[in-house]
């Protein structure tokens, strides 16, 4: 597989959320607003990139019987570092994300790429695979955060977009359903349906 394909495929035919249906829980939990969705996206991307790189570098020295334990130790260490950076520089977002940053440790995307790719590939392709899957995940999270905050709260990144456009004065009201977790699940379902309708080879 070419290096470019490692970044390109997770955006379309091998998207971790739309095709593999991994990492859906965070889609429901952190996408009510755009800012936490972006921060979570960056956090997961950094963790999956670095964990892929580290495990790939160590792949020939890890005993098969304890590989999952080693992977969890590496991912846990990276997640703790990311969490501390967020608390130091983005404390408000860190509080908003709460336990969900810690739950990156159990994110199926991270563990899936370590098992399926990093354990059998060289460091550079593993790093690119982590980047591609992180970005593929990020596109969906940021899209959901954009739509849900705009139509649910009338804001984007806290800026009152709908108010500035004067839509409230003509009777527009925020859709409270948009900021509820079930709506995120519905939106993910709609995106998956649209994606598979455009890619017939993905249909079972």
What are these regions (language model features)?
Residues 157-177:
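Short, membrane-exposed interhelical loops at transmembrane-helix boundaries
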Residues 34-50, 70, 94-105:
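Structural signature of hydrophobic alpha-helical transmembrane segments
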Residues 62-75, 96-102, 129:
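Cytoplasmic-side transmembrane-helix entry/capping segments in multi-pass membrane proteins
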Residues 81-96:
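Transmembrane alpha-helix boundary signature
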Residues 51-64, 111-121, 194-196:
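C-terminal ends of transmembrane helices
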Residues 6-9, 56-60, 125-133:
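Short amphipathic alpha-helical coupling elements at transmembrane boundaries
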Residues 7-18:
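N-terminal membrane topogenic signal
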Residues 24-28, 44-49, 76-83, 105-109, ...:
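Hydrophobic core segments of alpha-helical transmembrane domains in multi-pass membrane transport
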């Amino acid at each position: 597989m070419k290096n470019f394909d490692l970044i390109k495929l997770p955006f379309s035919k091998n998207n971790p959320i739309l095709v593999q249906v991994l990492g859906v829980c965070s889609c429901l939990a952190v996408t009510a607003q755009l800012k936490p969705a972006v921060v979570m996206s960056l956090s997961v991307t950094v963790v999956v990139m670095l964990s892929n790189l580290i495990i790939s570098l160590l792949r020939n020295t890890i005993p098969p019987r304890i590989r999952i334990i080693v992977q969890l130790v590496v991912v846990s260490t990276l997640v703790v570092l990311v969490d501390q950076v967020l608390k130091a520089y983005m404390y408000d977002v860190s509080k908003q994300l709460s336990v969900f940053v810690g739950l990156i440790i159990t994110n199926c995307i991270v563990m899936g790429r370590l098992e399926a790719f990093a354990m059998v590939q060289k460091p550079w392709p593993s790093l690119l695979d982590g980047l591609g899957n992180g970005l593929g995940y990020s596109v969906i999270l940021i899209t959901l955060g954009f739509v849900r905050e705009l139509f649910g709260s009338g804001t984007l990144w806290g800026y009152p977009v709908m108010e500035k456009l004067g839509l409230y004065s003509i009777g527009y009201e925020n859709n409270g359903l948009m900021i509820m977790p079930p709506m995120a699940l519905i939106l993910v379902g709609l995106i998956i349906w649209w994606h598979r309708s455009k890619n017939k080879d993905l249909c079972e």
